[in-house]
Every structure is written in structure tokens, then in C-alpha cells.
Amino acid sequence: MGISSSDLKKVSRKVSKRHGSVSGGATAVTFSYYFCFALLLLLALPLLLFKKKARAGFSEKLGIIPGRIKSKQRQLAGCLWFHAVSVGEFNAVFPLIKAFKKEHPAAELVVSTTTGTGQALAREKCRDLAEVFYFPYDLPFSNKAWLDALSPSLVAITETEIWPGFTYECKKRGIMLT
């Protein structure tokens, strides 16, 4: 079931009031930004391959969509996507997730995190509320894969974490970002 435009605006206002708005303009996204990000990722590859903690969610961060999400792709289209970096941000946004799901039980919600601790907590608390996954690396192919798979109506990013490539891709697709 889709989420109405007025519901999205209400959620956007609530999140913006509580956490501040994230600008949708990402005009400075250039080849050099992506090149530098990819180079840093390449330099970090040995750490990512040999440290179990750093390896957590690596495939999801690269844009490889897990089967549990692929199998629900149609159902998740038009979802609300909440992003919380870690435990603190997740704890801040969780009451909003619960309240929204209570008011709109048929709405599809997804939650992404960046850290393993945030991921573990989100999976535990959102078991019956939302699909949980790792936020993609800010590279064109990773962002495209997740945005194609989910086709969200709105992305709510907690705190002020800003990813220029992700922001640009959302803006290009007309996805509301708060």
C-alpha cells in the first residue's frame, strides 16, 4: 500500500523539526568526488577483507541487494527509508518509526545503518516493523542499486550525515530527502 503525499510531508516536517533538514542540492558531485571515494575504498580494502568487524555488511554497502529484499521488491516500492548511522541515531528515530507504523500499519518501512552495532539494534527492534540493511557506500553503482531496489517515496536521514552522491541520486529521481 502506498503512502500519501500528506503523510510524507507530515513525517518530513516531524523529522526536520527534530533533527534539522538535509539539503537536497548536490550540485558539487563530480567525477573527482567519486574517484576519491573509490580510491579511499580501494586503499581500505585490505582492512575490509581481513577485519571481521570492518567486513560486516560489505556486500550490501557495495550495492549487492540481499535475497530477502529482492523477494519483496514490488512490495517495498514507495517505502519510507529511515537512515541511522549507529545506535544513538537509531534510538533517536525509533519512536518515529514505531509511531508511523502504528498509525499506518500497511506502510512499508526500511531502515539502514552504517555500523554493526546500529545494525544489530535495528534488526532486534524492527523485526516486525521494517526491513533492515546497511547503507550503501556513496558510489554511483551502490546508490543506484539500492534506490532501484527500493524506489522509496522519502528518505529520512537522522542527524546531519550528508552523502553528496546519494543526495544527488535522490534529487535526480524526485525522492524526498529530509
Regions found by a protein language model. Give the residues of each.
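Short hydrophobic helices that act as membrane-entry/anchoring signals
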Residues: S23-L48, K52, E60
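Active-site and donor-binding regions of nucleotide-sugar-utilizing enzymes
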Residues: L45-T178
